[in-house]
């Protein structure tokens, strides 16, 4: 990966809807060259997909919580697969420290969050620790510099 690839990645990270021509103008390449480079980045697994940025409050999921899971001896071995069955869980991270997993949860109400926590504890034999997000000063901050 060279500096042009890094510049292309930085632009895509900020706005994945840019055309190849627009990216090309910004990095000094023809649109067709940008297209070729992006396809190679996709094939190498560096660019894994393109996503819409969703306003979860407007979409009916105004409650965001970080839920930590501490395993017990009776906890199943395939926690991530089991967690994926819960539709309110957006992300699951395997973490080091006192807990084994951290989940990002989006819920329509605090009651729905409470029901999810009860279900996680019952079905996964885990201890949960929850933090409800009050506000999000920033998220999805571009990390690549081009």
What role is predicted for each listed range?
Residues 1-146:
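A compositional/biophysical signature of low hydrophobicity enriched in polar/charged and small residues
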